[in-house]
Amino acid sequence: MEAKPVPAPQPRPRAMAEPLHIQRLEAALNMRPFMNMAKRSLRKPLSSDEETDDEHVVKREHDVQDSDDSSTVGVVRMKQSSKRKSRLLASKEERQSVKAQLYNFNDLTSDREWLYDLLLSDTESDDPTITEDEYVQQLLREHVREQRQRKNYYKKAANAQYAYYGSGLLSNHDIFAERQLATAGVRKRRRRTKQEILMARLAEAQAGPKPPKQRRRGRKKRDNMGSPESGEVPPSELGKYTFGDTLPNNEDDDEDGGEVDYKRELASLALDYPEEEEIEEEVDVEGGTEGQVTKVRRKRKNPAALAARRRRIWQIMSKKESGRLQRIKSNNHKEMLANCKRVAGMCAKVVRQRAINSQRIMKETVWRAKRLTREMLAYWKRYERVERDQRRKQEREAEEQRKQDVELIEVKRQQRKLNFLITQTELYAHFMSKKLGQGSEEDQLRILSQLDEETNARLAAQDDYDAGEMKLLAQENAEAAMQRDLDKTRAFDVFAKKKEKEEEEQAQESVEDIKPEPRPEMKDLPQPKMFKGTLKGYQIKGMTWLANIYDQGISGILADEMGLGKTVQSIAFLCHIAEHYGVWGPFLVISPASTLHNWQQEMSRFVPDFKVVPYWGSPAERKILRQFWDQKHLHTRDASFHVVITSYQLVVSDYKYFNRIKWQYMVLDEAQAIKSAASQRWKLLLGFSCRNRLLLSGTPIQNSMAELWALLHFIMPTLFDSHDEFNEWFSKDIESHAENKTGIDEKQISRLHMILKPFMLRRIKKDVENELSDKIEIMVYCPLTIRQKLLYRALKQKIRIEDLLHLTSGSTTTSSSSSASNLMNLVMQFRKVCNHPELFERRDARSPFFMRCAEYTIPRLIHEEGLIHRMLPSRKHLLYNRFNIFKSEYIQRSLFEDVNVNSCFGFTRLCDLSVGDMVEVTLNGLIDFLLHYRRVLEKYPLLAYRRFWWKKQPDSRYQLLEPMLENKLALDYMPPNSVLKNFIFTAMTANESSVYAFGDYFTYNMQETIEHRVIRSKILKKKTSLIEEMEDVSKQKLEIESVEVQTKSNAKSDVKVTTLLLLPEFPHRPRKPRKYVCEPLSMPRILYDLGQKVQAVHRYLYCDSRSAAWSQIRHNQCENSQGRELVSSGLALCKPHGGWSSIVVPDKETLITDAGKLFVLDNLLTRLKANGHRVLIYSQMTKMIDLLEEYMWHRKHRYMRLDGSSKISARRDMVADFQTRADIFVFLLSTRAGGLGINLTAADTVIFYDSDWNPTVDQQAMDRAHRLGQTKQVTVYRLICKGTIEERILQRAREKSEIQRMVISGGNFKPDTLKPKEVVSLLLDDEEIEMKYRQEAKLQSSSPIPAATQSERKRRHPQKDVNMGGTTIAATSATQNPDDDVPSCSSAAKRIKLETEEDFIDVGITSSASSVGTDSNHPTLSQETYVPGATCVQQTEIDSENEALVVDGDSPTMLGQNESMNFLDDLSGISPMRRRHHPRGTRRGRPRGSTRRGGGHGSIPRVLTPTQAATPAVPATASQAAAAGTGAAAGTSSPLPQQEVSGGGDNAGVPLHEEEYRTSPSGQSPGVSCKRGPGRPRSKTATPISRGTRGAPRARRPMGPLLVPLGRSPDDTPPSSSPATSRAPSPLSGSHGAVGPE
């Protein structure tokens, strides 16, 4: 009986399958089959009879299999296998193919085919009609069947190798082949029993005779699926095994064993028949080899036996098979009934569903009708509301248009006022120009025409402007102002008689009768005769201009460039007044302290006729000088004094004495000293009684337009009387243009020039003086040393973005000024690092800690027994000395009395030691031992010399005594020039060498650089022979490069080119690195030059013993003179590398090498001194000047020093010495003290060690050398550290230096007011700010928020809960805690909130952020809360002078007496800040512009505190305004007062009583329900209950702006240009009234 064929699975690679439990787990978790089944079930109709038919077929197949006997088993299995193949190819093919891939069916045997069916079968659903008892019976039958199958399975010995029954189906190969062979082995074929043979013959007899099989020699090899394994039972013998009943619904155990009983009866029946005839046939032996034929004997049955057997079989079938078929029929009937019931239930379900749907449709029809009715009603209501809103909108637009007209008229009125004032000023200047002979009637008409403007027909009813009336009024005011000036001037005039009559006639004439055509051109006045000197042409023109404005009673500003002789022109003008008008004073000259002596010298030099009083000195000296102020004979030549020269400080201190005299003329030198109109100096000098004022300033406009106004108001108080108006005229627009914010009005600038023209005269050097030498300015970029880099990096790492933002977000002027001072301290620390690191910490001399050891007394016994037991006074002298074996007598007897070779002292003959030498070495102590060693060392060189030169002499006994002489490496044996001496380390250490080892190193070949070529060319250029060599090379047509150095001149616009011939470049030939083997290597100095930490003096010993005293004396004297000499020489050899002194004095070279600037300066000064130049070195820090002084001492440069601490008398002498003595090489000056008024033309080189904030200060300093009288070319070197804060400071200075081109010649500028944000931009550049910002954001995002903080935040900010019906349950107030007793509207509640709440900070577009300060030292900061999403912009001005920023004293720092040197101490109290990554209104699920507690167009206006009202309000965006409004309203439990607020957002100006509904936490009015059910329309939007706050969609803002403004400051931004900024509401908004900007 052959095994049925099994379909072979798809071939796939042989690999170990996954374990069964993992496969089941993956199958259980795989949702794809479930989804596919769901799709199929949804697509398939509800009634399908295919599955039931298949189930009936399967059951019938099972029944037929049970009913057939063993002879039909193979046929049934063949049918099942064919059906199995059809099932695999049916609709379940995909699932069975997947299952087939999970198992290995290659070695499937017949006894495990049922397992194949089980694995590939689908799981059947339970029968719904089966009862619980039937289910239990079925479980029991399955259990019995399982036991029987297990028993039959293990009967085969081949199956013992498997761990479980399914083994072999889970893997493609057997991993325990050895165990399989050991278990199964080679089995013999089992012989069949007679009963088996009988049963086989009966089966063959029923089948009928078969044709004999023919031999097939070439039969193909059987398939692997049908061939049994070794030790496995072949499929033909499976009949003898009983596998039990496989029907699923067996009812009892008797039926299970029916097949076995049936076979037994057949066997017993066959034994009763007689023997049949035997037939021999040739058949193939199963399991044999191919072609093997055996003979089998078979017995043929007779007809009677067959008939009896047939009868027996029919009886059995009638008894047992009929009942079984009946049961099958009943089961089929039951299943049919169950299917019918199931179909009936489904039909009822469908009908019921249709009924429900019809009912729902009926209900929805009524509901839809109602909803349509509501929608129609809502539509018409909405139509009426829209119509009403449209009407209101038109009315509101008309009202707004009326307001805009009123505002436009007001703006025009302000513009007309400013225009009128400017026109009046221009008209006044025109009248003055006419008096000077420069104006015309056309200019007057042009000026008056500026008051005309076009009329607007729409505004004609409200605008009453009359241009003609304004022209008359402006002309009258200008005439009145000029008349007042004339009257004031006339009161001071005391002329000669010939001039008095002309003055009276001029006074009677009115201003209107001024001749329109005065002198067509001013003629230059002659040089005064009393002036002892020669004026240049431009100086005479300047004196003439001064005389003309003096005639007209006008004060002026002589603003010639520095170095053009303003002092000489003013002195010549004073001589002209005295000579032409007969007015000899009194004249008051006020100048800085450094130029007082210069004025006195110039006066005595050029005008010796003037009586000059130098008013300075001590109070007693000044009191004596005031005695000469006799007011008799004033204005005459016989007066006691004509000119008083004093300083600004003395004028302020002695103001009461100066104000008693009516000065004829007051000259203020370096007038920028009164640039601040708020200073006491400016106010006191303005109150002086004088006829005219003259201001001398090389830089009249240094920083801002306010300084220009201060100077103009000082010379003409009646005209420029309003600082605010002047600021409105020019300052705001020009400064905005300078900061690249707005465009510049060229017409406005031209009008400003027109105003300044009569009062100011300015010439520059290149226009008036062609004889002045050139000036070259060179920027020298210096690198930072390692020490500077470490300090600079450490300072930078301590800067935090939050700290800078906290400093830049001050709310008051006081906090802003303190923030600016703190930031300036940071800047000063960086500048110190760039100048020299020793400004922080000096390298002082270090010495070890000196300590004295404890002194104690030694008992006599210890001293005698332990120390002097070998000396003569000792009692044990005989024991230690007399009886010693090294005694001379004993050694003598041992050697010579009885010559004994074995004597213990026989080695002395080989060592060249005598008896006395032996005693000295052993008994006389260390001194004698060292002396003996010294003698031996002196003898070795002699022996080596004798051995080296006396070659013919035979070897002496020293060969035996000194065998080391034969060593070739002996130091004494080596020649003097031997290289081997380098390997003797003792020689190197004795010579204080740092060689510590020998090793290998490499040298690499590199190409020559241009610097090396320049150095070689400069050296060769000095020798004529080398120049000739260069000419020879040029003749050979070699390429010679040239380096061109272009120098720009300030006096001339040409360019000089100097050529330096360079030597030919060395040809570069790449070579391999050269290796040096076994070369001495030096040790780093830090390893052998370390200073001691502790040093102790030698200990003194005391003992009550005379012998101890004698031994100490002998020890101190080293026994004898030879011992002293030996000790001194030994100490000399033992001298350390750095000497015996333990004090470590820093090397002066480190002073140079520690700073990159000083290192560059050292090389520069060396070159300048070699070329014969003289140098001025400027620095702002006096401590830096101290370091430069130390450097000058170190380099032996002769120098002088002048700074703010120098006395006035000493300054004069120092300047005179430097001008006259040529041996003084360097003049060290402070930029502020030594940069004004002094003449240092003896120097031709100026070096700025550090640059000033103000470029004009540096310009004045360099003009001390580049001025009249300078004959050499002036070179200016400016030392700048590359990549540091100095580069940004220099860039700012360059922008500020263009102010003169803006105001005087046209241009732009930067103001000098250092605001905190600008100082931050100096500290960090754009990349560093962005990098620090990203790092901080990354740290904040990565840091986990504690659970307690999250729970607390959720408690304070609960989210809104929205139910399905549409009712919105509002969140409680974020600021009011139900557990607190304090009301949320009080200030105490706000303080509690600020102390506990942690919120994020959102940064706006303008990059200005504000933080919540919790420091108790700043109450103004702690009382203001900040709304997330809002940005604080504060307009603060710091009107401070530069002297407050850089102190020119002993210390350059900004710290007070009690302040620490740590510049970050003020930043320690800054609270941590967080940044909101998602601004409100931009998160998912919320519309743009909306917030958590309000919409985009919030209706609640913001309430500002008086602190906020101090600064102009800036309109905010809709989202930020809503956030601010809702934040203020959420914490208010009562309605706000009915006050209008301007600038509160979109609804500014709306009374607060209309917005009371917003004040409740839920946003609804109290007592009104707003629930809306399904289908109900929304409430009317016009009511306050559900008024929408959602605005129109707008573009998203950038998420990550920079925190610090770089290009411009938001403080000066007009409100209309910064829509993204808004002020944060005050915590007291619920209790205080609203205050808006006026």
From Swiss-Prot:
Q: Where is the composition biased (Polar residues)?
A: 1338-1350
Name a single GO biological process: DNA repair
Annotated residues that bind ATP are located at D560, E561, M562, G563, L564, G565, K566, T567
GO MF term list: ATP binding; ATP hydrolysis activity; ATP-dependent activity, acting on DNA; ATP-dependent chromatin remodeler activity; DNA binding; transcription cis-regulatory region binding
At what positions is Phosphoserine found?
A: S47, S48, S67, S70, S227, S230
Quote any Pfam family the record assigns.
Answer: SNF2-rel_dom
Record GO cellular component, one term: polytene chromosome
- For this protein, what is the EC number? 3.6.4.-
Q: Which domain of life is it from?
A: Eukaryota
Domain annotation Helicase C-terminal: ranges:
1160-1315
Where is the protein localized?
A: Nucleus
Which PROSITE patterns does the record associate with it? DBINO, HELICASE_ATP_BIND_1, HELICASE_CTER
- Keywords in UniProt for this one? ATP-binding, Coiled coil, DNA damage, DNA recombination, DNA repair, DNA-binding, Hydrolase, Nucleotide-binding, Nucleus, Phosphoprotein, Transcription, Transcription regulation
Write out the biased-composition intervals (Acidic residues).
Answer: 250-259, 502-511
The family database entries (PANTHER family) matched by this protein are listed as: CHROMATIN-REMODELING ATPASE INO80, HELICASE SRCAP-RELATED
What does this chain do?
A: ATPase component of the chromatin remodeling INO80 complex which is involved in transcriptional regulation, DNA replication and DNA repair. Binds DNA. As part of the INO80 complex, remodels chromatin by shifting nucleosomes.
| Subunit and interaction comment | Component of the chromatin remodeling Ino80 complex.
> What's this protein's name?
Chromatin-remodeling ATPase INO80
Taxonomic classification? Eukaryota, Metazoa, Ecdysozoa, Arthropoda, Hexapoda
